[in-house]
Amino acid sequence: MTPISQRISQKSPKLRETKQIQMTTTDKSAGIVTDSEAGPETSLLLNPHEGSTKKAPSDSYHFAYIIYFTLGVGFLLPWNAFITAVDYFSYLYPSTAVDRIFAVIYMLVALVCLFVIVVFYAHKSLASFRINLGLLLFVIALLVVPVLDLVYVKGQVGLYAGFDVTSAAVALSGLGDALMQGGLIGVAGEMPERYMQAVVAGTAGSGVLVSLLRILTKAVYPQDPDGLRKSANLYFAVGIVVMVICAVFYNVAHKLPVIKFHEERKNEELIREKSEEKGSLTGLAWRTTLWDIVTKVKSHGFGIVLLYMVTLSIFPGYITEDVHSELLTDWYPILLIAAYNVFDLVGKCLTAVFMLEDEKIAVGGSIARLLFYPLFWGCLHGPMFLRTEIPVTILTCLLGLTNGYLTSVLMILAPKSVPLRHSETAGIVTVMFLVVGLASGSVIAWFWVI
């Protein structure tokens, strides 16, 4: 075992954000200090070589938090735009299972690219380069649909060459997701937990934004081909604007004192590692270290896979296809999806108030969510009172709330279970687990009906 591997196997570095009054504590059971205990920016850097203590500057006006939240909104918005416009694509290409094909393309490309990044490039490429490249690919992919619609499709049905180009744009978005999400989660993992919480909450914010747009377009535009076309173009236009905002925000973030502090902290760790190891990790040494990182976060990853397997096998397929309401008619699935997204956001924001610091309990919660299967089954086949709008709405809200909270907990804890210098890689590995969960849930949704 290499020296790096030995250090990863030793004491978990959960003390990296200890309160000032406990900064000399070395008790391994101290755990991660929450923002409510130590304040959002009281992280301390203990440099054994200098014998000095550096205190992180405050996040003035919460600019850094807002930036990371916005970036979280950004990397899921392209996928949300494609999948929300599926009604228009289904109209254009009636003999194609558009939503299923898009899901396979997007997730397969994202998963393969994440694997390549984590194995070959994560330890020797800059996260800033990957994030900016991902944003550029997102903008290009989002431009494809409205430009294609303007110059070629023009609302005509059956031009399947247009579907091929659109599918290529979905694949490009999957690549952009792997680059941006992997890099962003990795960078957030190197910082105090409030920034990972901001990113994760941003992903839920993306869902809420798209739900609001869907409600707006349904209320404003007629549900005919022209209305569907205008709605789709609006989704992609909003997506492009948000991508530009994300690009500006991310490249401005490095000028904030709090971001500079944590970047310098990471650089000091890297310099110390190279001096102790007499060089950078390459080849077999890196693969051994990577395996140790995977071992450290495997329980978190299992919980995340299970979370999204359950969620995606029920939502949105079951909610949009299997339940009906005479009262709410075609508004019913739209409102259920909005309810899920709102409570997913609430759950992901709750970790800013109360942070569960034991991953075993969080994984247990992920396992307990298997109970949603018989509960939703009861809403279809059980007693009549379970088949009404109220039980389905309550279960949908609980599905979103538990998904949001447990996702946030596991995503925050995973990078903190390894040394700081490996937090970025741990974050990327965790994203791989997340994509596996998404893919598993989508497959179950296709072949198994509640």
Curated annotation (Swiss-Prot):
InterPro entries linked to this entry: ENT1/ENT2, Eqnu_transpt, MFS_trans_sf
| Reported tissue expression | In young seedlings, expressed in root elongation zone, root cortex, root-hair, at the transition to the shoot and cotyledons. Expressed in hydathodes of fully developed leaves and pollen.
Any one GO cellular component localisation term in the record: mitochondrion
Q: Check the record and name the SUPFAM superfamilies matching this protein.
A: MFS general substrate transporter
- What domain of life does the UniProt record list for this protein's source? Eukaryota
**Induction info:** By nitrogen deficiency and 5-fluorouracil plus methotrexate.
Where does it mainly reside? membrane
Instruction: Tell whether Transport is among the UniProt keywords.
Output: yes
Q: What does the record say about its membrane topology?
A: Multi-pass membrane protein
What cystine pairs are annotated?
none
Where do the TM regions start and end? 63-83, 101-121, 133-153, 168-188, 196-216, 234-254, 300-320, 334-354, 361-381, 394-414, 430-450
Question: Keyword annotations for this protein?
Answer: Membrane, Transmembrane, Transmembrane helix, Transport, Vacuole
Molecular function terms from GO: nucleoside transmembrane transporter activity
Similarity comment: Belongs to the SLC29A/ENT transporter (TC 2.A.57) family.
What is its biological role?
Nucleoside transporter involved in adenosine transport and required for nucleotide metabolism which influences growth and pollen germination. Has high affinity for adenosine when expressed in a heterologous system (yeast).
Task: Tell me the NCBIfam families matching this sequence.
Answer: 2a57
**Name of the protein in question:** Equilibrative nucleotide transporter 1
Tell me which species this is from.
Answer: Arabidopsis thaliana
